[in-house]
Amino acid sequence: MSADRPGAGAVEPARPAAPRAGNMLDYARRELETFSRRGLCAVDSLILSWMAYLRIPADADEVVAGIRGWDGVRLADLHRAEYFGDYFAGMWSEEDGLRLLAAAAASPRLRDVRVVGHVESTDVRAEKQFAAVTFRLTDDLSYVAFRGTDSTLVGWKEDFNLSFRCPVPSQVAAARYLADVAGRLDGEFVVGGHSKGGNLAVYAAASVPADVGERITRVFSHDGPGFLPEFLSTGEFANVAPRIDKTLPQSSLVGMLLEQQEGFRVVKSNRL
C-alpha cells in the first residue's frame, strides 16, 4: 500500500487543515474517494452527525426498515425510498437535512456506506430523548453517531438537565448503545454527534469498558455542551480526552454550556 493511501481503518490527523472553501454540501458533492482510499475527517464526521437526525417511519418498507438491524441499508437506498416527509421531521431544518441526504446519496464517498443499528427512544416522564445510528465506513471502521436535541419539549428539557445532573438518561443509553455496537461489529470506531449528540459521544466513549474504549480512535463533538466538573475530573474522562475533537461555530450557544475542559476549535459556520 502506498504511503499516501491510508488503510481501511484510517482517520485523518486530529487537527486536520480546514477543507477548501465551501460547506458540507459542497464537500459531499466534491469528494470522490471512498473511505478505504482516504481516511475520515472532521467534515465527514459532521455530515454523519447530521444523518443521525434521520427518522424511520413505522410503516417503512423492508429495505428501509433494515436500518434497525445490523445488515443495514445503503445511504443511497435510503434516499431512493423517498420517505422525505418522515426522514427529518422534527429537525430544526428539514429542508437542509434532505438536501444533505441527497448529496450523500449521490456521492461516491458516501453513497455505499451502510447504515445499521438505528434506535430512537423518547420517554417524557424520564425526560429522555435519545437516538443513535451506526455507519459502516469500511470493514474495519464504523462511525457511531448520536442524535442531538430535536424540536420536542422533552429534548430541550434533557438539554437543560445537563447543567446540574450527570448522567442524564440519554448519557446512560449512549454508553449502553456503544457497548452493544462494539459487541456486534468488528474493527475500530469513531464516535460523534452534533449538539447534545456530541456530549453523548464523549460520555459514551469515556464510560464503556476498557476493551471497548481501546477500539475508539477519535471522538467528535460538534457544538456539544460540556460537562459538570465532577465528570471532567474522572480518570475515565482523562483517558479519552486526548482523542476528543471538539468544534464550536462562532455563534455557538449550546456548545458553550458548562465546563469546556475538553478543549475546542472555533469554526466559521453560517450555512449548510
Annotate each PLM feature.
Residues 2-43, 48-61, 66-142, 146-188, ...:
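Alpha/beta hydrolase fold serine-hydrolase catalytic domain that processes acyl esters and thioesters
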Residues 192-197, 201:
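Gly/Ala-rich beta-loop-alpha elbow adjacent to hydrolase catalytic centers
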